[in-house]
Amino acid sequence: MTVKARPILNISLKAEKAKMSEVAQELSKRLKVPVFLGPQRQNELVSIEFSELTLEPALQLMSPTVYVDYEIDTGSTAPPKPLGIFFFDVNQGEPPVTAVVTGSSQSLLVEGNTEDGVEPATEDEKKKVEEEPLRVSYKNSALTVKAKKQPLPLILLKIGEELGIPVDIRNENRSIVDAEISKLPVEDVVRQLSPNIRLFMRADLTRAERRALRLVLAEPPITTQQNP
């Protein structure tokens, strides 16, 4: 097995009746990422050959059921960083949400309005909703955020509430945000909101689905000033 990081991460593998557990161990060592195997996969013998495939297509050839947990740094142009790879048995179900993505704290959104999710019935109600300073909706894997002079932590907490995921506010900077973002993937939305967000995602390669697991508003990186 060879793993190259340049120009982009790519994997080559030639295995002839190799134990899947040994292939997974080698992959984990090369990628420096934990790899988890389903019980039935441990002693399975595999024969695979491919060259210079990017991560996800390579993983799909290695297992019928694959999940990958990623960390996305919105301030970086680097591709999402894999945190854990799961080669599971067909009927094993999904890994626990906290298998590799864990957090010590969670911030909560406290609101007075309990009518979220109720469609406005009249034109007046629709107009009232449209005039609200912060609106977040998530439909068909697309996120919409409309914010008028709203603090960034509040926007992220509202996104977390809509997605049903924990949000960790570590940066108390109350930067005020105006946003008009319609029907984009979660990753694209948070990239537009701030460079200090860490988004944790899970890719289900079998079903070609991606979902958010956790949002963190991190402290901005400390920049060291160079003397002229």
Map each language-model feature to its residues:
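N-terminal targeting/assembly segments of extracytoplasmic apparatus and virion spike/baseplate proteins
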Residues: M1-P228
